[in-house]
Amino acid sequence: YEDKVVIVWFWELGTKGTSRVLCVEVPSGKVLWENDAARKYKKYGDDKLVQFYVHYWEDGNDDRDLYAELDVHTGEVYTRRYPGYNANVFATTIYKDYLFYGAEKGDAYVGAIDLRTHEMLDEVMIDFTRGDFNQIASIGVHDGQLYVEIQTELDHSDIHVLDLDEDE
């Protein structure tokens, strides 16, 4: 950001401490706010950081699974759960007003959350040839197309390209 830097840090696994987020004014170095809402955020717009993470559980998702939105001016965090949603979501990207994510639920899916309303849109299944690995490794947007990398083997990935409807 022009006048501030947001720093997210995580303690090393196995050590004692609390992961933190802090906002530092530039160039003074003054700490504007600090909290313990450390997540792997992505920048959205001029004043927000967002994250969507879900880990599949046989009994349904747990308390850590949610959408989180951090206001960079205040440090306040808005969270939202999607009751009944159960998948593995590790890869996300932001494009315009949408957070796109890759979801693993036995098959591979791509979904989106409208960042203005927080509505979860319908997911689309991706047809791919299975291997021994089968995980969504990355997701990104370029020139109006959504690219999804599915790692099917330890040393091989398939790239799937979906056209985005810019009017919807």
Pin down the residues of each PLM region.
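Repeated scaffold domains used in trafficking and secretory/extracellular systems
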Residues: 1-2, 34-48, 52-54, 82-96, ...
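Structural motif
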Residues: 14-22, 58-68, 106-112, 154-163
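Blade-level signature of beta-propeller repeat domains, shared across WD40, Kelch, NHL, RCC1
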Residues: 132-168
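Inter-blade boundary loops/turns of WD-repeat beta-propellers
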Residues: 26, 72, 115, 164-166
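Small side chains
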Residues: 29, 68, 75, 91-92, ...
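Short beta-strand elements that form the blades of beta-propeller/WD-repeat-like
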Residues: 4-15, 47-61, 94-104, 142-152
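A structural detector for beta-sheet-dominated domains
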Residues: 9-10, 36, 53, 73, ...
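Aromatic (tryptophan-biased) beta-strands that constitute blades/sheets of beta-rich domains
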Residues: 30-35, 76-83, 119-130, 165-168
